[in-house]
Design a protein with these regions (language model features):
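Flavin-dependent oxidoreductase catalytic cores
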Residues: 1-83
Length: 83
């Protein structure tokens, strides 16, 4: 819901058995997204899917509440990413 700067670099590390990442879900926050990013996306003529993450149930409820009534077509809950 709030702005997140993400984790400091390096965010990705290649190992012999695969790749590790710890991106930190960098984003401007839901209010800035609605104000600054959504108008641009609306002009694209494509389906708009908002992927939201939170630390507690209340974060998800509040973020969805703020997105309701906007031009977002779908909301995806990111409940599996520990970042």
């Amino acid at each position: 819901m709030k702005e997140r700067p993400g984790n400091p670099v390096p965010r990705v590390c290649e190992t012999p058995s695969g790749i590790l990442n710890c991106v930190g879900l960098q984003n401007p926050g839901v209010d800035a997204f609605i104000k600054d990013d959504l108008p641009f996306l609306e002009k694209s003529g494509t389906v708009i899917i908002a992927n939201i993450a939170g630390s507690a149930e209340e974060d998800y409820v509040e973020t969805v509440s703020r997105l309701n009534g906007t031009s977002v077509d779908m909301i995806e809950l990111n409940i599996s990413c520990p970042n």
